[in-house]
A protein has these predicted regions:
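N-terminal Sec-pathway targeting helices
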Residues: 1-14
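Lipid deacylating catalytic domains
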Residues: 6-9, 19-135, 142-275
Length: 275
């Protein structure tokens, strides 16, 4: 290949690369119409025995939909030391932090609460956030709940504005620590029986931030009021820890007009008509 041909080939490759980059930027362009443009970060907490890879599908979907262009990872070592991989640029819109615990199988309340605190403190010290959202799956919910139990009233930490609980098992897991014959009061949502875990979390009724957090509780139903691993009744028990705190402090009328909202979504398995 002569020098002239090589130059033309190089020029062609450069043009292709530029075209690819432009296309990539177009596909990840922020959607200013359908999504709120905010600099508040959202933290994703994975479940038992899992990792940040489990959060990748959701974060990739968020990027493709134009929700954000910024996703970083917070890796938490066994001793609680946090390493941030990636950078959140100043003014980044809806940045996401995938949280990963190296010790991803411990249910110890003090440990998982400390891990969550260390992540929040690291992000606060690095980026000076004053607010945040949290999304947690399965065991990740326990980490968030115990964090709130210990630090929910700490005004020196970033405030949680929105909390999404996916497949939470706050009342216990069937065959492990879920009370037999568990039922929820139709009016208050109070469980008929409480295991040690739930009794500990009752403290949330005293420290859970008032008029601050919007909660979305998501649980699946493949039939039989279960998602296959967690019974719906265990997930529904979350309501008593959050919503009823307002009833203990205010009248019911004030509760109905409260700024704090609690939504519950049940995903059901749809039977296919295909053979």
């Amino acid at each position: 290949m002569n020098k002239k041909s090589f130059c033309w080939l190089l020029l062609g490759l450069v043009i292709l690369c530029i075209a690819f980059l432009v296309k990539s930027q177009q596909t990840t362009q922020l959607d200013h119409t359908n999504y709120l443009q905010n600099t508040r970060p959202t933290l994703f907490f994975h479940g038992y025995g899992s990792s940040a890879n489990a959060e990748k599908h959701m974060t990739d979907t968020a990027k493709k939909a134009g929700v954000t262009e910024t996703v970083i990872t917070a890796n938490v070592a066994n001793d609680g030391q946090v390493k941030l991989t990636g950078t959140i640029p100043k003014g980044a819109v809806n940045p996401i932090i995938k949280v990963e615990y190296q010790n991803n199988r411990t249910p110890d309340p003090k440990v998982i609460s400390h891990y969550a605190y260390q992540v929040v403190k690291k992000l606060q010290d690095t980026y000076h956030f004053k607010e945040m959202n949290v999304v947690a799956h399965s065991m990740g919910n326990m980490s968030v709940l115990y964090y709130l139990l210990e630090h929910g009233s700490d005004e020196n930490l970033p405030k949680i504005v929105k909390q999404v609980a996916i497949a939470n098992h706050v009342a216990g897991l069937e065959g492990m620590n879920l009370p037999q014959g568990l039922a929820l009061d139709s009016q208050t949502g109070k469980p008929s029986s409480m295991n040690e875990q739930y009794q500990q979390l009752l403290g949330l009724r005293e420290v859970y931030p008032e008029n601050q957090i919007d909660v979305l509780n998501i649980y699946g139903d493949i039939g039989g009021e279960t998602d296959g691993s967690v019974l719906n009744i265990s997930s529904k028990a979350l309501r008593y820890l959050f919503l009823q705190i307002l009833m203990s402090r205010k009248s019911l009328m004030k509760l109905m007009s409260s700024q704090t909202m609690f939504w519950a979504i049940r995903w059901t398995k749809v039977k296919s008509n295909k053979p």
